[in-house]
């Protein structure tokens, strides 16, 4: 893969930034694509733009505002509370989001001569999102190849690792402090360690605390 090109689906969050660093190490050339779907915090897009600029990565922002029109949710509507009732999908789930993002990333990838697509979806910290499952990604990979007659390969470096292991991967890639300080995971739009209260921040912090304990234990 060292001689090939990849497109990374990039939000500016912890997971996709870790995947961006992973792709930079794995591929000869990397581009990033970010989707503007009228997310709750425009800072998310600004964050992605700044990270790509700092890393010298060619970056495309695509207008996907129609997604909010089709599937209103707590990620795009400030009047909707972020909730997750047992047995139901979280209010942050956006129907069709990863299906559309990966499909448009594939169109872009083919246009720029890349066959590798990298995404940070993960089953281990599964939040009930059906489009984060490995079976979905594998199925879509086949569908995209057939639909465009092109040998795409969708890579999911985080699929089988939890948040602590994601922090470990960023550390192994030499990007731990960068990811911790410059990414935006928080649903309330606070860069870095975030608000500490929303579900995304709690998951991120729990993983970070676990990894730091493991790293400290290994060094003793």
UniProtKB/Swiss-Prot annotation:
InterPro entries: QueC (IPR018317), Rossmann-like_a/b/a_fold (IPR014729). Its EC number is 6.3.4.20. Pfam families: QueC. Keywords: ATP-binding, Ligase, Metal-binding, Nucleotide-binding, Queuosine biosynthesis, Zinc. Its cofactor is Zn(2+). SUPFAM superfamilies: Adenine nucleotide alpha hydrolases-like. Coiled coil: none annotated. CDD domains: QueC-like. Zn(2+) binds at residues 186, 195, 198, 201. Belongs to the QueC family. NCBIfam families: 7-cyano-7-deazaguanine synthase QueC. HAMAP family: QueC. PANTHER family: 7-CYANO-7-DEAZAGUANINE SYNTHASE. Homodimer. This is 7-cyano-7-deazaguanine synthase. The lineage of its organism: Bacteria, Bacillati, Bacillota, Bacilli, Bacillales.
């Amino acid at each position: 893969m060292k001689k090939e090109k990849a497109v990374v689906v990039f939000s500016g969050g912890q997971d996709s930034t870790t995947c961006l660093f992973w792709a930079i190490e794995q591929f000869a050339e990397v581009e990033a694509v970010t989707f503007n779907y009228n997310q709750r915090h425009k800072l998310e897009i600004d964050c992605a733009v700044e990270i790509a600029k700092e890393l010298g990565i060619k970056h495309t922002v695509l207008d996907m505002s129609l997604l909010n029109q089709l599937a209103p949710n707590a990620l795009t509507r400030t009047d909707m509370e972020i909730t997750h009732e047992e047995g139901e999908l979280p209010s942050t789930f956006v129907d069709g989001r990863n299906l559309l993002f990966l499909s448009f990333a594939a169109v872009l990838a083919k246009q720029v001569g890349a066959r590798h697509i990298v995404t940070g979806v993960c089953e281990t910290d599964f939040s009930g999102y059906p489009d984060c499952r490995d079976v979905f990604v594998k199925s879509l990979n086949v569908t995209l190849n057939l639909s465009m007659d092109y040998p795409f390969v969708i890579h999911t470096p985080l699929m089988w690792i939890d948040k602590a292991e994601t922090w470990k991967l960023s550390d192994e890639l030499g990007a731990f402090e960068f990811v911790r300080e410059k990414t935006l995971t928080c649903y309330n739009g606070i860069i870095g360690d975030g608000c500490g209260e929303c579900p995304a921040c709690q998951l991120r912090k729990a993983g970070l605390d676990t990894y730091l304990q493991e790293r400290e234990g290994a060094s003793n």
